A protein has these predicted regions:
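Conserved catalytic-core segment of NTP-binding enzymes
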Residues: 11-12, 111-221
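A generic structural signal for short coil/turn motifs at secondary-structure boundaries
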Residues: 1, 94-95, 200-204
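P-loop/Walker-type NTP enzyme "switch/lid" segment
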Residues: 23-122
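Short secondary-structure boundary/capping segments
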Residues: 2-6, 32-45, 100-102, 145-150, ...
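Walker A/P-loop phosphate-binding motif and the immediately C-terminal alpha-helix
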Residues: 1-24, 29-31
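Solvent-exposed, charged interface segments at domain starts and junctions
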Residues: 1, 5, 58-76, 146-153, ...
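Extended hydrophobic secondary-structure segments that form protein cores and membrane-embedded regions
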Residues: 19, 83-86, 189-196
């Protein structure tokens, strides 16, 4: 869904940045048609989010910039450029790097929050729309994507109670934490989106679920 939205926005003339923050299950670049660009091969050599983090906490004076991580996806259909920052360089060490990240230390000892905020401001100046692919559920990485970085959280869910009440819990927690951020932020907006519409085949069940969605999620919008 995120890749489709990104492509449509670029087609409509918006300058778009897509960021893969799903570090545990990376690969947003695979959803873009390989005929548009060599995105899969680029990930073997071009750094991404994981590499930015390790550069930030590393001892080298020359630090990576997020601009060093940009992969441009080009198409004759796009009126503006579509840029991608992948989860990280796929060089054989990615999994161990992702597993060894200490998020508490990053934020509490390395001032990672201010580093993120600086990048966030630069992204906003450079692009019309920034779309961030997040890990599902309540995780350290998910907190970055639902609390620290976004102005709007799009919550994809399915027609079952676990999914419905799960996204409700996620956004309620995110809003509480969002209000405590030491940065200037407007109210965190939420857009719940059911990922499947089965009204054509299961009309009555679909109608019941839509009523339930409206009732349970009315506080979100």
């Amino acid at each position: 869904a995120l890749a489709n939205v990104a492509a449509l926005l670029a087609k409509w003339g918006r300058k778009v940045l897509v960021i893969d923050f799903d570090l545990e299950a990376p690969g947003i670049e695979k959803y873009f048609d390989s005929s548009l660009s060599s995105l899969n091969s680029f990930r073997n050599t071009v750094p991404g989010i994981i590499d930015l983090i390790y550069s930030f906490i590393g001892s080298k004076k020359e630090k990576l910039s997020w601009k060093d991580c940009i992969i441009k996806c080009t198409s004759a259909h796009f009126r503006k450029e579509l840029s991608i920052i992948t989860a990280g360089r796929d060089d054989g060490n990615y999994i161990s790097k992702a597993q060894n990240l200490n998020w508490d230390k990053l934020f509490n000892e390395n001032d990672f929050g201010n580093y993120l905020e600086t990048m966030r401001k630069e992204w906003i100046k450079e692009y019309d729309i920034i779309l961030i692919d997040s890990r599902t559920g309540i995780t350290d990485i998910g907190g970055i994507c639902t609390i620290h970085l976004p102005d709007v959280v799009v919550l994809m869910f399915t027609t079952n109670d676990q999914s419905l009440y799960g996204i409700k819990d996620v956004i309620e927690r995110a809003r509480k934490q969002h209000e405590t951020l030491p940065f200037d932020r407007s109210t965190l907006l939420a857009i719940p989106v059911p990922s499947r519409d089965e009204s054509r085949t299961e009309y009555e069940a679909s109608s019941r679920w839509k009523k339930k969605f409206s009732k349970e999620l009315s506080e979100l919008y």
